[in-house]
Curated annotation (Swiss-Prot):
Belongs to the complex I subunit 2 family. Its EC number is 7.1.1.-. One of its GO terms (cellular component) is plasma membrane. The lineage of its organism: Bacteria, Pseudomonadati, Pseudomonadota, Gammaproteobacteria, Enterobacterales. It holds the Pfam family Proton_antipo_M. Signal peptide: none annotated. It is found in: Cell inner membrane. This is NADH-quinone oxidoreductase subunit N. It is a multi-pass membrane protein. The gene is nuoN. GO terms for molecular function: NADH dehydrogenase (ubiquinone) activity; NADH:ubiquinone reductase (non-electrogenic) activity; quinone binding. It comes from Yersinia pestis bv. Antiqua (strain Angola). It is an enzyme of class 7 (translocase).
Length: 487
């Protein structure tokens, strides 16, 4: 098979990030320099982001049988790269105080980003599995990066063991689907799995096992038990990546699989997804109420947010594609910037590394009185995650409710409204604590010039985008409408 220049251009983000991995690896081997390796990482990711402009010029195409590059993959590739950039930026000041090797952190983030980019373009079960493993394996190292702390090491081992079990379920599910359909490509699966085949036991068993494997990666109920422990144990910049890039990439590929393979037209599959969605929304929100650890709280809230998104997967079968696709694009963009801001504030408060992160809610008590702008940013992020009007989070929730109503998914829409009402309590609890009287002695605090650091700039840009796109969302909606898959 000969690769044309157009195909090479279509693969530019993947190639640039892959090349950056090699350059950073050689740089570490030549000389350990934290600043140089961080700079190389950020330059590589920025070039990958800029290359999306040229990818758009060559038009949608199947680059290989495993990869399909179109507007859909470009949009989610952009989101994954932005999340990876933010993670690297937050990691730099955190690693300044880290006593061991710092440079490998960037290498692991780049490899995980490579897996995420592959997932957004995956058009085949082989590339889906390869992308998930490429994304997941570096996370074992990243979660346990602060290995001198027992909790970080425990989180890494817990994630590794459960992830291995989930991958085996996913692989076995794929094998059952292949045994029945004779194809591994999404399009081939869609063509061979006709309506009559959907109800065959092997197909349903295969789909069920894939839902188990993917449900773990997306931390959906009942496969979510690892989430709060891992979010709490992982360093704050790694929790940022876990909450954003890994969830966005995996959800993007799941959505593409559901669009091409109508095997999910099965009433049984739709019922299972609906139950998982409602359980995730209620469990995530109810468990977050009692949390005093902000990373655990955001971990539980991410379970609820993925539950809201799962409604779009159910609606794909009952609705034309346009609205579910728009909903997922707008919601994930809002979730990305809100999470980057929230975890960014936690990362800034936890930098430089001094052992445990600033994760207790008590650490943020009275933040407004000595860091008013930072507390304003955190307030905006909490309001956006709660879905309050004038924020981007509200636009995403509005799309989810509108889609649920138009698809006649009344009880799922009711779950969204109920979940949002519960969520409002604990998001406002975090917000109120920022404005209480501060403690006598500060446990952790950000540097006085935090807004001039790269991490501070990322947090401020996220807050501005959440507000501006919350008031005037049309540019984002237009971008999402352009990001349509090549059918």
């Amino acid at each position: 098979m000969t690769i044309t220049p157009q195909q090479l251009i279509a693969m530019l983000p993947l190639l640039i990030v892959g090349l950056t991995v090699v350059v950073v690896m050689l740089s570490i081997a030549w000389r350990r320099d934290h600043f140089i390796n961080a700079t190389l990482t950020v330059i590589g990711l920025n070039l990958a982001l800029l290359s999306l402009y040229f990818v758009g010029q060559v038009g949608p195409m199947d680059v290989t049988p495993l990869m399909r590059v179109d507007g859909y993959s470009m949009f989610y590739t952009g989101l994954v790269i932005i999340a990876s950039l933010a993670t690297s930026t937050f990691a730099y000041p955190w690693l300044v105080g880290y006593p061991d090797n710092r440079e490998e952190f960037y290498l692991l983030v780049l490899i995980a980003a490579l897996g995420g980019i592959l997932l957004t373009s995956a058009n085949h079960l082989a590339s889906l599995f390869l992308g998930i493993e490429l994304l997941t394996l570096p996370l074992f190292g990243l979660i346990g990066y602060a290995y001198r702390q027992k909790r970080s090491l425990e989180a890494s081992i817990k994630y590794m063991l459960l992830s291995a079990a989930a991958s085996s379920f996913l692989l076995f599910g794929m094998a059952l689907l292949y045994a029945e359909s004779g194809s591994l490509s999404f399009v081939g699966l869609g063509q061979s799995l006709s309506d009559s085949m959907v109800h065959q036991p092997l197909i349903l068993a295969g789909l069920g096992m894939m839902i188990v494997g993917l449900g773990f990666k997306l931390s959906l109920v009942p496969f979510q038990l690892w989430t709060p422990d891992v979010y709490q144990g992982a360093p704050a910049p790694v929790s940022t990546f876990l909450a954003t890039a890994s969830k966005i990439a995996i959800f993007a590929v799941v959505m593409r699989l559901f669009m091409y393979a109508p095997a999910a037209d099965s009433e049984a599959v739709r019922l299972v997804l609906s139950i998982i969605a409602v359980a995730s929304i209620l469990f995530g929100n109810l468990m977050a109420i009692s949390q005093t650890n902000i990373k655990r709280l955001l971990g539980y809230s991410s379970i609820a947010h993925l539950g809201y998104l799962l409604i779009a997967l159910v609606a794909v079968q009952t609705h034309e594609l346009a609205l579910p696709l728009e909903t997922i694009g707008v919601y994930l963009a809002g979730y990305l910037f809100s999470s980057l801001g929230a975890f960014g504030v936690v990362s800034l408060m936890s930098s430089p590394y001094k052992g445990p992160d600033a994760e207790s809610l008590f650490s943020y008590r009275g933040l407004f009185w000595h860091k008013p702008i930072l507390s304003a940013v955190m307030t905006v992020m909490m309001l956006s995650l709660a879905g309050i009007p004038m924020t981007l989070g509200f636009i995403g929730k509005f799309f989810v409710v509108a889609m649920g109503v138009s698809a006649n998914l009344w009880w799922l829409t009711g779950a969204v409204v109920l979940g949002s009402a519960i969520g409002l309590y604990y998001y406002l609890r975090v917000t109120v604590s920022l404005f209480l009287s501060p403690p006598q002695s500060l446990v952790r605090d950000t540097p006085s010039n935090w807004a001039l650091t790269a991490g501070g700039v990322v947090v401020l840009i996220s807050a501005i985008l959440v507000l501006v796109l919350g008031i005037y969302p049309q540019p984002l909606i237009t971008l999402v409408q352009m990001a349509q898959p090549l059918m």
